[in-house]
Amino acid sequence: MEELQGYFEKDRSRQQPFLYPLLFQEYIYALAHDRGLNRNGSIFYEPLEVFGYDSKSSLALVKRLIIRIYQQHFFLSSVNDSNQNRFVGHHHTNFFYSRFYSQMISEGFAIIVEIPFSLQLVSYLKEKEIPKYHNLRSIHSIFPFFEDKLLHFNYVSDILIPHPIHMEILVQILQCWIQDVPLLHFLRFFLHEYTNWNSFFITQNKSIYRFSKETKRLFRFLYNYYVYECEFVFVFIRKHSSYLRFTSFRTFLERRYFYGKMEHLQTEHLIIVCCYYFNGTLWSFKDPFMHYARCQGKAILASKGTHLLMKKWKYNFVNLWQYYFHFWYQSYRIHINQLSNHSFHFLGYLSSLLKNYSTVRNKMLDNSFLIDTLTTQFDTAVPVIFLIGALSKAQFCTVSGHPISKPIWTDLSDSGIIERFGRICRNLSHYHSGSSKKQGLYRIKYILRLSCARTLARKHKSTVRTFLQRLGSGLLEEFFTEREQDLSLILPKAITFPFQGSRRERIWYLDIIRINDLLNRS
């Protein structure tokens, strides 16, 4: 019991108990603005006809917000006013201020709660002295790891991490790390009133989706911390899985201790459940070869063990979310596939293991014999179907992949239209540079290239053929990256691998820290 208690407390010792007073500091909201938390239309610089003030008056609005936070029933009154204004249609300015204040509070709160975790990250990097830390942040850094490790693995689990169904779950997780009780009460009250405000207009199961759309940074922080807590518990279970005793299969099916419901606080509840779970008679497998990778809400769990072991971890995840986070998770959201027969979609790539058979004739003195060899290669391909679906959602083509024009961009200049289409192509080429086959990427480029031509032809009220003849090859040059032109002079166009045909060289860049927006659409 003391060992488990120490494990959960050793990383939670650096708690910051005095964060609530920062809500009343003007520089917090100025910092939120300076860091560009609202790049898609900042709430600090709204149009004059909506705001009634110029952009220099945002500081006065921040001061007014701080004064209203001191008031006892500000949130309740603002919610009632906003609901009345929504239905009646009067006092539009007051309703806008209530919505404006809620967004400002969410952004300021996101800045405050990020402070202790940022300090902890900086101190951790100084202690560990990790070289080239920025390279490890790259999304592409995970694929060389896959190339080395997944070649010898048997199964992979495709996991979709669920969203909590209630905001209180996020607050309870956060209170394990932050001891500032007034700040947690303020967050709980803000989330409660915010969801009640939107419950008049949306259903209950969409309240979190509405909250995530309007307060992106705060929800992103809460969700990322929730995922971190999931992984924190997963690492604990993984480290202690080898301590389980080997017994008969019948006791494995019972699992009576794990299903016992415990009424305790968040951390104590998990420790007690884990104690009963690990001290009970449970048949388990020791698998030292297990690897885990995650990006956003999707995770990959690969193992060298058997299918039964993967099912064990599958139900461990289900029970974890059910008894620790107190919400139901459907087991069908975790897919277990055999790596030799299935591919998995992760980080915008379709990854799989390719087996290549070859026969080598060996001659020794007067005897000759044939040797059959098998080589396995980690292959990454461009998910053409997913990208075409993303392009159709963005209105660049139809569902079947037929290019169409982009009417909303016809008001731009010709150079602006070409620059936008070219930037999309360059980003896709840069991100999918690790694909072993480029045919799918060429198809996506062709769709964007023809969509650009159709958009320009629509702007000038001409046909695509006439416009391309007048433009010449200048349009095509905009869709090549500078790196592709440089690499074509350095690397050969085709590289022959052993026991394979001619394939393109895969290149992984260590400066990509986010997924392309088109991949998120898919």
Curated annotation (Swiss-Prot):
Q: Which InterPro entries does the UniProt entry name for this protein?
A: Domain_X, Maturase_MatK, Maturase_MatK_N
Q: Which GO terms describe its biological process?
A: mRNA processing; RNA splicing; tRNA processing
The places in or outside the cell where this protein is found are: Plastid, Chloroplast
One of the record's GO molecular function terms = RNA binding
List, alphabetically, the Pfam families matched.
Intron_maturas2, MatK_N
Record GO cellular component, one term: chloroplast
- Cystine bridges: which residues? none
Q: Which UniProt keywords apply?
A: Chloroplast, mRNA processing, Plastid, RNA-binding, tRNA processing
Q: Which domain of life is it from?
A: Eukaryota
Q: Which HAMAP family match?
A: MatK (MF_01390)
Which family does the record assign?
A: Belongs to the intron maturase 2 family. MatK subfamily.
Functional summary from the UniProt entry: Usually encoded in the trnK tRNA gene intron. Probably assists in splicing its own and other chloroplast group II introns.
Q: What is this protein called?
A: Maturase K
What is the source species? Gladiolus papilio
Write the gene name: matK
